[in-house]
Amino acid sequence: MVLAPAVVAVLFAQSPGGLVSYEEAVRCAGLTQAASELEGAESPEGRALYDAALYWSLAAMRAGTAAGRTSQAAENDQTRARIEGVRQLSADAPAARAALRQCRERAPKLD
């Protein structure tokens, strides 16, 4: 899916907590992608996680561009964060669950 840069900028600016660092955006992208993958898209919860993952993925790509990272490097960072997120969430790590909750709270509702 390709979204116009203006749409991505609007999405990124809508974060209730304001702008975030590249590292934080990648962490949220990884956690929400991992949670979405683990939940599946069949349930309302899974769809909400998918929306949050989409938002954070776009925000991370936008933040990466602003930080001078290539799109490939930003994608690789998200992949690593997702793999780590799957490990942590599968192990029911309290810190990962808390971080996921915060990421979801900061993502705008896309429905």
Tell where the protein language model's regions lie, with residue ranges.
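Secondary-structure transition/hinge residues
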Residues: 1, 37-40, 111
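Compact alpha-helical subdomains of small soluble proteins
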Residues: 49-111
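Short N-proximal segments of mature Sec-exported proteins
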Residues: 17-69
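Classic N-terminal secretory signal peptides
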Residues: 1-19
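Compositionally biased, low-complexity repeat tracts
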Residues: 13-14, 26, 81
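Residue-level marker of positions within ordered structural domains that often coincide
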Residues: 6-7, 33-34, 108
